[in-house]
């Protein structure tokens, strides 16, 4: 009788332990870990915003915006987003996304002598396995330009 009770208790522990393990969701990264962005000057007025995207995460191309902030006379002439991957998104329908990394090229127009520029970058992304999407994020990055 005692042996049967112990077997039954072990069975219950195994069933509930397995159920908890099977339903455990992966831990989500903080947004700053999932989506890292840096800017650097490539040449004269050409700047690159480089995104490093964690494994199993992606960024929406259409949710990316780049603007100049608090830098008089400096404007963005053009922004070039490379081609991404098309994804059927459960929340937004057919969307272009980036995985792993993406480099966005930015051409500035600035007066002579302008040394510092602040770029404000808006973006949004999701974790692929759970389908959890982060709220839109914004990052302001200052860059010292060389002539």
Residue ranges and their predicted role:
Residues 1-4:
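N-terminal secretory signal peptides that target proteins for export/translocation
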Residues 9-18:
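Bacterial N-terminal signal peptides
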Residues 21-147:
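Extracellular/lumen-exposed scaffold segments
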Residues 7-10, 116:
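Intrinsic disorder/low-complexity segments enriched in polar/small residues
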